[in-house]
A protein has these predicted regions:
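Short C-terminal tail/terminal secondary-structure segment
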Residues: 48, 127, 138-151
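Active-site helix of classical SDR
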Residues: 23, 59, 67
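Residue(s) in the substrate-gating loop at a strand-loop-helix junction
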Residues: 43
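A conserved structural motif in NAD(P)-dependent oxidoreductases
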Residues: 111-122
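Alpha-helical segment proximal to the catalytic Tyr-Lys
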Residues: 28, 72-76, 135
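Active-site loop immediately N-terminal to the catalytic Tyr-X3-Lys motif
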Residues: 1, 48-54, 76-77, 114, ...
Length: 151
């Protein structure tokens, strides 16, 4: 947390405020339809502390709590809210991590599946949560990390 408050505010704005704004835009229509599914992409960072990514992890923990609160408040309107907490996924966002051999080796050493995730592995869970198969899943965080958080 040793960072200027302006940087902390930017992380919170990018990761929390933006989700709040988007949810407030879609929730009235979902309430009117008495149906809907909100899926927020969080991170395994939201499940643990960090001596490097403190503000990011705090914002991702807030994503997880936002989902729980939306689920509690709007469940009566048949609106579900869930989050997905990915580990290291082969995306442009995380490219600096998976392209760095030392970081990649450290991540793989702590991942039972010995690989990083692929974007379609996140997309598949998002599709399930938004589909009929996910109609009774509400307020949950689904971790997709190859087992990193279990060891």
């Amino acid at each position: 947390l040793d960072m200027p408050i302006e940087k902390f505010d930017k992380v919170m704005s990018n990761n929390i405020k933006s989700n709040q704004i988007l949810c407030n835009l879609v929730l009235p229509d979902m309430v009117e339809r008495n149906d809907g599914s909100i899926i927020i992409i969080s991170s395994i960072g939201g499940l643990k502390g960090s001596n490097i990514l403190g503000a990011y992890n705090i914002s991702k923990a807030a994503d997880i709590m936002m989902v729980k609160n939306i689920a509690a408040e709007f469940g009566k309107n048949n609106i579900r809210a869930n989050s997905i907490a990915p580990g290291l996924i082969k995306t442009d966002f995380a490219k600096a991590l998976w392209e760095n051999p030392d970081i990649l080796k450290a991540v793989l050493g702590n991942t039972p599946m010995q690989r990083i995730g692929e974007p379609d592995e996140i997309a598949g869970v998002a599709v399930m949560l938004a589909s009929k198969a996910g109609e009774y899943i509400n307020g949950q965080t689904i971790v997709i990390d190859g087992g990193t958080t279990i060891v």
